[in-house]
């Protein structure tokens, strides 16, 4: 979903920092084309496979083994050779948010900083139910914002000079 979101904004080159279960990620990408294509298997004479679809996604994806227990900075350092030396974006694999990538990049460029990190105020963990003795729910109170603090929302824009600090 993250790659489709970036692609919708015209960003189609990805470097994925692989660690835990990287073999599953690599297999998924290796099979992605076949899983999403119309295919004819011709076993009559030539035993060939014909894939009928054209390009599914306009993506170039590089998968890099960055280690099992490596922290974020170490992962960035390990993929440096696969980056083109320009401003790059970083998103955590569990990053699901309504972020306008073009606006994020424009904000980053307009402020001239080495790094821009999206921030969010997390909601409380649970909504509150008022329940009568017979089991009827009489009120539902939405989760409250915790303490008003901000957390890293997982979408970042970084300048190549960040490598000097890692």
Mark where each language-model region is:
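Conserved N-terminal catalytic core of the sugar/cofactor nucleotidyltransferase
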Residues: 1-92, 103
């Amino acid at each position: 979903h993250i790659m489709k979101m970036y692609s919708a904004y015209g960003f189609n080159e990805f470097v994925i920092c692989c660690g835990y279960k990287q073999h599953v990620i690599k297999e998924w990408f290796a099979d992605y084309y076949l899983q999403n294509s119309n295919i004819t298997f011709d076993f009559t004479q030539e035993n060939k496979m014909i894939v009928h679809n054209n390009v599914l996604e306009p993506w170039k994806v590089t998968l890099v083994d960055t280690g099992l227990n490596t922290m974020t900075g170490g992962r960035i350092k390990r993929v440096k050779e696969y980056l083109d030396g320009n401003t790059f974006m970083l998103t955590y694999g569990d990053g699901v948010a309504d972020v306008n990538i073009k606006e994020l990049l424009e904000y980053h460029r307009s402020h001239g900083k080495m790094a821009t990190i999206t921030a969010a105020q997390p909601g409380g963990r649970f909504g509150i139910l008022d329940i009568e003795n017979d089991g009827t729910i009489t009120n539902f109170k939405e989760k409250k914002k915790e303490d008003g603090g901000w957390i890293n929302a997982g979408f970042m824009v970084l300048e190549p000079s960040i490598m000097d600090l890692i």
